């Protein structure tokens, strides 16, 4: 590159003037020429440009570097549908408590007893698992209540609930044994109208929720085998409101009156009285609400949804007492029909029997299926869709063989008379040494 003489002379003049600190007409600072970074308010940029600024101003002042304050991390907020694991929302594994209710009468002392408090403190892992499962249940069911609408298939509803539940507890159940760490406590029940319980859609189910349906949604979620069992009913026509109100009142009555040393037969009387004080007018006809007599609430054991004690929905002579440490599913079912169910329909619910005798299985497909059931579900109830998820194929023959052999129990749907309507509400309660904790209680019910 060549430079002519006038141009060279001009450059020498500029250089000489710049060395003497003189202002040059038409010259600009680096900042004015846009040579600073766009984020020129950062402390690092100020520090880098300090010498140049000092030279321009003819000063020797130094600017101190200011350290940036680290930005505070914003707490994570749950997505819609729920997908962020609870371990990220509650990093200290301290999950919300359920509703704590002090015991009454002769058990009132338990609230302040040092001995009982000590026993309570020994249950920290037990309570943490239960509260995590309960928080997952609340978040999933509240999302479901906002989003279940007529026109959806039962398969869409079930898969949405179960996928969200698995994400929240951080275990998708696709690897061997993963669903035993945490996951579904039983198949999601989606029971329409006269179907009382134990129906979950099998693969290929085409049933669509209609505007005039009454839908019972029964969800179980477990962490470490601690199953939270809670249910609600949805209806989209206000003519069913009294049916839902009756059953919700009955369940809340059962929850309120339950406690250590309470006899279950007496508790059933309180439940029946609350429920059967209602009636419901449907299409111009008034129906008394009846408690379903041949169904019961139940205790919950680790990895087993049905324990050894039952809570009837009607008054009975059962003198069994509720005891410290018991976990109960207080559920009630009300009906506009006869108040009794019969079994019938396509089976979806199954469970490995804990008391089943070992037998030599001659059918090879039954042997391999039994191994998969033990490793993935143990005694937690499962459905056909869950077998599909873990890659089991052509298993129906082997499954039926296990049922006939008494190794696996099947649970057919429970049905009231055709043309009737039924509703369900349910909570899980812990009879802790110091208080009764309604572990599944939420703002919704």
From Swiss-Prot:
Alphabetized Pfam families for the sequence: Peptidase_M24
Reaction catalysed by this enzyme: Release of N-terminal amino acids, preferentially methionine, from peptides and arylamides
Name of the protein described by the UniProt record: Methionine aminopeptidase 2-3
Comp. bias (Acidic residues): 38-47
Subcellular location(s) of the protein: Cytoplasm
Region of interest: Disordered: 14-115
InterPro entries linked: Creatinase/aminopeptidase-like (IPR036005), Met_Aminopeptidase_Type2 (IPR050247), Pept_M24 (IPR000994), Pept_M24_MAP (IPR001714), Pept_M24A_MAP2 (IPR002468), WH-like_DNA-bd_sf (IPR036388), WH_DNA-bd_sf (IPR036390)
Binding locations of substrate: 198, 306
EC number in record: 3.4.11.18
Functional note: Cotranslationally removes the N-terminal methionine from nascent proteins. The N-terminal methionine is often cleaved when the second residue in the primary sequence is small and uncharged (Met-Ala-, Cys, Gly, Pro, Ser, Thr, or Val).
Keyword annotations: Aminopeptidase, Cytoplasm, Hydrolase, Metal-binding, Protease
Compositionally biased spans, kind Basic residues: 60-75
Family statement: Belongs to the peptidase M24A family. Methionine aminopeptidase eukaryotic type 2 subfamily.
Polar residues composition bias: residue spans: 85-95
Binding site for a divalent metal cation 2: 229, 298, 331, 426
Biased composition range(s): Basic and acidic residues: 97-115
Classification via HAMAP family: MetAP_2_euk (MF_03175)
Swiss-Prot/TrEMBL GO biological process terms: proteolysis
UniProt key word Metal-binding: yes
Entry cofactors: Co(2+); Zn(2+); Mn(2+); Fe(2+)
CDD domains xref list: MetAP2
């Amino acid at each position: 590159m060549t430079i002519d003489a006038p141009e060279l002379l001009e450059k020498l003049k500029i250089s000489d003037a710049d060395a003497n600190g003189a202002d040059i007409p038409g010259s600009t600072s680096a900042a004015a020429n846009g040579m600073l970074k766009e984020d020129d308010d950062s402390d690092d940029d100020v520090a880098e440009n300090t010498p140049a600024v000092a030279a321009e101003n003819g000063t020797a002042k130094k600017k101190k570097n200011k350290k940036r304050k680290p930005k505070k991390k914003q707490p994570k907020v749950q997505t819609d549908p729920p997908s962020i694991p609870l371990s990220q929302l509650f990093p200290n594994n301290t999950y919300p408590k359920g509703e704590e209710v002090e015991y009454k009468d002769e058990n009132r002392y338990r609230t302040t007893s040092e001995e009982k408090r000590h026993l309570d403190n020994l249950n920290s892992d037990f309570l943490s698992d239960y509260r995590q499962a309960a928080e997952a249940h609340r978040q999933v069911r509240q999302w479901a209540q906002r989003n279940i609408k007529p026109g959806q298939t039962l398969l869409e509803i079930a898969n949405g609930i179960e996928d969200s539940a698995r994400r929240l507890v951080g275990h998708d159940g696709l690897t061997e044994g993963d669903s035993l760490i945490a996951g579904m406590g039983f198949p999601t029940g989606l029971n329409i109208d006269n179907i009382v319980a134990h129906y979950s859609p099998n693969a290929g189910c085409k049933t669509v929720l209609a505007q005039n349906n009454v839908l019972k949604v029964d969800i179980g979620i477990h962490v470490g085998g601690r199953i939270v069992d809670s249910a609600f009913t949805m209806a989209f026509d206000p003519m069913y409101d009294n049916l839902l109100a009756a059953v919700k009142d009955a369940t809340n009555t059962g929850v309120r009156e339950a406690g250590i040393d309470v006899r279950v037969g007496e508790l059933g009387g309180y439940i029946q009285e609350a429920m059967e004080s209602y009636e419901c007018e449907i299409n111009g006809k008034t129906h008394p609400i009846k408690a379903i007599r041949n169904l019961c609430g139940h205790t919950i054991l680790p990895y087993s949804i049905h324990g050894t004690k039952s809570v009837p929905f009607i008054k009975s002579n059962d003198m069994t007492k509720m005891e410290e440490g018991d976990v109960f599913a207080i559920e009630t079912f009300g009906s506009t029909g006869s108040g009794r169910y019969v079994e019938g329909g396509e089976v979806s619910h199954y469970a490995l029997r804990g008391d089943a005798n070992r037998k030599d299985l001659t059918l090879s497909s039954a042997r391999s299926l039994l191994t998969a059931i033990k490793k993935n579900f143990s005694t937690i109830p499962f459905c056909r869709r869950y077998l599909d998820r873990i890659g089991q194929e052509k298993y129906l023959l082997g499954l039926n063989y296990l049922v006939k052999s008494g190794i696996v129990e099947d649970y057919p749907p429970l049905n009231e008379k055709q043309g009737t309507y039924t509703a369900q509400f349910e909570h899980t309660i812990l009879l802790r040494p110091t208080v009764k904790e309604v572990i599944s209680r939420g703002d919704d019910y």
